[in-house]
Regions:
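Alpha/beta-hydrolase active-site loop signature
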Residues: 87, 113-117, 193, 220, ...
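Serine-hydrolase catalytic machinery in alpha/beta-hydrolase-like enzymes
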Residues: 45-154
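The feature captures the conserved acid-bearing segment of alpha/beta-hydrolase catalytic domains
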Residues: 185-253
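C-terminal catalytic histidine-bearing segment of alpha/beta-hydrolase fold enzymes
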Residues: 244-281
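Bacterial N-terminal signal peptides that target proteins for export
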Residues: 1-8
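Boundary at the C-terminal end of the N-terminal hydrophobic targeting segment
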Residues: 20-23
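Bacterial N-terminal signal peptides
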Residues: 9-17
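Primarily recognizes the serine-hydrolase "nucleophile elbow" in alpha/beta-hydrolase
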Residues: 145-206
């Protein structure tokens, strides 16, 4: 009798506690039903990619605009392929690309995933399998972007792949196709390469010895313990575990930085050193 009462009491306490424990966890939502690019929409994602070409490439001034309207080029440059996050090509990404061209003489482009009509969008958290649909979409776009870059008349053969948040998952998981050019390095912004709510498994696939720069906020609102629905009590909030043993990996933690941080002063300093080492030497 006492055992039964204790069990019932424990169950009641758990039931009463459950709402309080989940009070800070929002209810995620999904809009849109498309998560696979067709040949046509993939071509549009590349044609409409935000492209920034240095003045040395155009022979005039820095070009900022969609790829399909880029001017005839007269020079070549190394490149950064950037994979945007869930919010698309935002002003911070455009500013990052502009700085690459003006200060480092590096070309760049960001394919536009939202050329896919009725593309799936979400507010977190949602089911991990639904996130994986988006990750598969973004992986296909990165593979296509590498193929697209190889055909650009201004491309000098050296490039880095970079991405932020949702887009950084694709960068961390990227596996080069046999016929594709090999990247010189990877930059992972605001993704921790860990198991958490955003993936079924993190599935990081970075080759041993690949130069990698991981830049994170010390308290990223999505991928650190600051997130009440992170889903991994052992997560450290950066890629240090996944990159353990890679002598060419660097982790930069920026205290109290926002989730979108590629233009923070400490981030810029780290980006410059990394890109000069892997692309400009």
């Amino acid at each position: 009798m006492n055992t039964r009462i204790s069990a019932l009491a424990a169950a009641l306490l758990i039931a009463l506690a459950a709402p309080a424990m989940s009070a800070d966890v929002p209810q995620g939502t999904i809009k849109g039903k498309a998560w696979v690019q067709t040949d046509r929409t993939m071509a549009e994602a590349m044609a409409q990619s935000w492209t920034v070409l240095p003045a040395s490439v155009t022979g005039d001034r820095t070009y900022e605009g969609i790829n399909i309207r880029a001017p005839e080029t007269k020079g070549k440059a190394p490149a950064v392929i950037f994979v945007h996050g869930s919010g698309g090509i935002n002003p911070q990404i455009k500013a990052f690309q502009k700085r690459l061209a003006d200060e480092l003489v590096i070309a760049s482009f960001t394919a536009d995933s939202f050329q896919l009509p009725d593309r799936m969008t979400y507010t977190s958290p949602i089911d991990p399998m639904d996130y994986e649909k988006i990750h598969a979409l973004r992986a296909s776009e990165l593979t296509a972007a590498v193929e697209f870059l190889a055909k650009q008349p201004w491309f000098n053969g050296r490039f880095v792949i970079a991405g932020t948040s949702e887009g950084a998952v694709a960068v961390a998981r990227y596996v080069r196709a046999e016929a594709a050019p090999a990247e010189a390095g990877r930059i992972i912004f605001s993704w921790s390469c860990e198991n958490n709510y955003h993936v079924v498994q993190h599935k990081t696939r970075i080759p041993d010895g690949m130069p990698v720069l991981n830049i994170m906020s010390s308290k990223d609102k999505y991928f650190s313990q600051a997130n009440p629905y992170l889903g991994n009590h052992e997560a450290v909030g950066n890629c240090s575990k996944a990159l353990q043993g890679n002598p060419n990996a660097r982790i930069v933690l920026i205290k109290d930085a926002p989730h979108t941080l590629m233009n923070e002063p400490e981030a810029r300093e780290a980006e410059d050193k990394f890109l000069k080492d892997v692309l400009l030497k």
